[in-house]
Each structure stands twice: as C-alpha cells, then as structure tokens.
Amino acid sequence: MQVLSVTPEIFPLIKTGGLADVTGALPVALAAKGVTMRTLIPGFPAVMEGFKKRKAVYQYPLLQGGKASIHAVQIAGLDLFVLDAPHLFDRPGGPYGNASGADWPDNWRRFAALSQAGADIAGGAISGYLPEIVHAHDWQSAMTLAYMRYGKAVGTPSMMTVHNLAFQGQFGAGIFGELGLPAVAMALDGVEYYGGVGFLKAGLQAAWAITTVSPTYAQEIRSPEFGMGLDGLINMRSSDLYGIVNGIDTAIWDPETDKHLVSNYTATTLKARAPNRAAVEERFGLDRDDSPIVCVISRLTWQKGMDILATVIDGIVATGARLAILGSGDAGLEGALLAAAARHRGRIGVVIGYDEGLSHTMQGGCDAIIIPSRFEPCGLTQLYGLRYGCVPVVARTGGLADTIIDANEAAMAAGVATGLQFAPNNGGAMLHAIRRLVDAYADPAAFETIQRQGMKADVSWDKSAEKYLELYRLLLSKRVA
C-alpha cells in the first residue's frame, strides 16, 4: 500500500512539537505492516542541509510567487519528498515565524504551496509514483485535500488528522484569488470560513476520513467548549470521525539504552534512577533530599494550564514536593515561574527554553510529571513518563484521560494504576493531586508498583499503526465501491 503523508514538520529534521514525533514515527511503524509511506515536507533550511545530492523529480516554473522543485530523498531512514521553494522556506527563525516569534505574514502562501505540491503528487505529477491514499496533518497541510477535491486527484481517498484544533489557519477572503482554486470552492462546503478562508476547515470538509489523536478528544471537539468554532462541521462529519492515540518511538525513548541518561535502568532496577535524580537536582539547583521531584516539560501557555500551575505553585511547595520546570512560551508565565523559583530557592528550579537531552534526563530522574492542560488532543510527555517510571499526574481531558489510569483505591487494589488524574481547569484539584502523589511517594512499595505498571504499558506505535492501517483499508474499500 502506497500512502503519501503531507506535513510541515517531521522528526528528526524539523520539530516544534509532538506533530513531528508522530509524522516521523508513523512511517516506520507502518512499514512493518507492509505500508510504504512517503512524506512531503517543506524545504526549510534545516531540511535542505540534511541532504547534499539533490535530484529534482518535479519542477515548477512558478509556484506561489517563485520557482520551486520537488526532490526525492532518503534521510534518517525516511522516504521524503522535499518541496524546495527558497522564496517561501529559506528564511531565518522557525518554520512558522521569524526569530522574534511573530508569524510570517505569508504563511497562507507558504502552506498553500505545500498543499498544491501534495495534490499534484496525488494527481500523478511524479513519474512512477501514485499514492493510493493521501494523509494530511494539521492546517499547514489541510489544503492538500481541497486541491485534490477540485483537481485531478478527486478520486483518491484522503485522511485529515487534527493534532490540535486550536490552530486552524484562518486568513482573509482577499487571498482566495491567489490560491488557484475554482470560484466554486469559495463556498460554505468548500474553503470559506466565517467570511474568510479556513485551511483546516477546508481539509475537514474535503477529507474522506477525519482522525484526531485520542478517542476522548474526538468526542470533546464535537462540543462548543472544545470545537473552536468547528464543532458544527465536525458533528456533521461525525460518522467519518475517529480517535487514535499516538504512540512513541520506544527505541528513542528507552530508559535501558537512552544515552541522555547518566544511569540506565529497567522496571526491575528502579534504584538505578538515583544518578539521574542527582543530575536533575544539580541542573535545577534543587535541595538534595528525599522529597519527590515533580517535573514540568511543556510549552508555557494557557492551553497547557501553566497559569493555573503558577497560581498554586506556593501550595505545591507546601506539600513538600520539589519542582523542576523546563519550557518556554508566554513571557508573563515565564516571569511568574522564575519569580516563584526565586521565592523558593532549592525547592523550585526553572530552565527557560527547550533541551531534548535534558527532557530525557528529567523523565529518567524525576519522580512524577505534572500535565495540567485545559485540553490535550493526545499528549506525548505522559507516555514518556510511563515509559520512564516518571509517574504522570494529569488533567482528566483528551488523550491524558485515555492513557493514564488513576491510582484510586480500586485501581491500586487491582494493581493497574499508572498515574493520577484530576479535574481540568481547577487549581484546587491540581493541588489535591500533588498531595495524593506525595502521600503515595511516602509508601515506597505502593509508589514503585505504580511506576512499574506504567513501564509495562504498551506505548509503542504498533497498536496505533494497526488502527491507521484499518482505516486506510476502509478508505480503499470505499474507493473500489
């Protein structure tokens, strides 16, 4: 089976969040099941530096304002099509914004070009390659499905995966004339969205199937609270809506072999976590004692509930727990957390930024990870926590609710608990969960049971890939029918 994946980022080449981890791991997991997935990505500088020998398999004399070409390459074990369009992608800063973090004003043009290329490939533009299914990820790739709908690949089955509905790619109506779509597309059942153009909306409208990254989130986005203005359309498409929990790359995230750890360990050698714990204490300036270390590895944003954390942080310290915080985001939240660290020297440590190696060390050395998101489509850090015996303490929402079994009395008695859950958007509930964690930590045998049960959980891509494969087969059967 030949599947074309279209995405703005892919690990290990370009990553701003969990999307890259998913798009990098899924092709590998599917390959083991007989699926050949090739991935179309933009030619950002970090991507173009990854390969020297360039073989153009398709040329554009003009694509959204300049010359462009598609290259077929293999990098890091991935089969890629790279859209080389220097006028759109060869820029300093991040993939979506400049060095100051402001969005590029022509993002609509940049990702319309990516989507046009995806639809062209689906329509047979590259000699000798014709995908049977096209799988688009998030708003930056969603227009691929609209271009397919109004072009040569209208009969090719397509899937739209929503990793976070909050990011929709909404633009003014004035751009429509430059998208290269027929006038009929600027309609309610096309790309029109509240008087403008909605990239994600267009993908949701055109897709043969829609997936989100957890069953709970698939249900949540049907409500006005989580639907972000798209709940009406999503309810209309509900018979084509599926929730599939992400997996993680268990070769990269393996405490037994992880080179980022000071000390490797397994579920039967948890005491070997101690040197990692010491490394966390040193890096974050924490007191050396026997109290639990709770970590935060997150974007510091409203969605992630970091403002709620900031309001109860003094109470968390009062429970006896220590905090190690790694992340960046809202300047006000960064300041509030740094101020808390200054108030509670030795009890709170904060590192502003993101450090992949440090995140591994934290999972391998901290006792718990708190994830207080207001909404969380899937979440990956709690899966890393399970894998590393870093007990997840999570808000009961989205994929967090689907992947963590709360350590209530019944779950503890049955030996199935893997973490703690609390009501989202509630500082008091978060604080109560931390108190429960501290109490559990005071009983080493019970706490290690939770750790080991989490480490036994299957968080690999195998089950998730099987569910995607089932959906691909369903879509192909619809095409034949």
Curated annotation (Swiss-Prot):
Source domain of life is Bacteria
Its pathway, per UniProt, is: Glycan biosynthesis; glycogen biosynthesis
Q: What EC number(s) does this enzyme carry?
A: 2.4.1.21
State the top-level EC class. Answer: transferase
Q: Which UniProt keywords apply?
A: Glycogen biosynthesis, Glycosyltransferase, Transferase
Residues noted as binding ADP-alpha-D-glucose in the record, renumbered to the chain: 15
Q: Which GO terms describe its molecular function?
A: alpha-1,4-glucan glucosyltransferase (ADP-glucose donor) activity; alpha-1,4-glucan glucosyltransferase (UDP-glucose donor) activity
Reactions catalysed? [(1->4)-alpha-D-glucosyl](n) + ADP-alpha-D-glucose = [(1->4)-alpha-D-glucosyl](n+1) + ADP + H(+)
Question: What's an example GO BP annotation here?
Answer: glycogen biosynthetic process
Q: Which Pfam families match?
A: Glyco_transf_5 (PF08323), Glycos_transf_1 (PF00534)
List the record's Gene Ontology CC terms alphabetically.
cytosol
For this protein, the record's HAMAP family field holds: Glycogen_synth (MF_00484)
Stated role: Synthesizes alpha-1,4-glucan chains using ADP-glucose.
Belongs to which family?
Belongs to the glycosyltransferase 1 family. Bacterial/plant glycogen synthase subfamily.
Q: What is this protein identified as?
A: Glycogen synthase
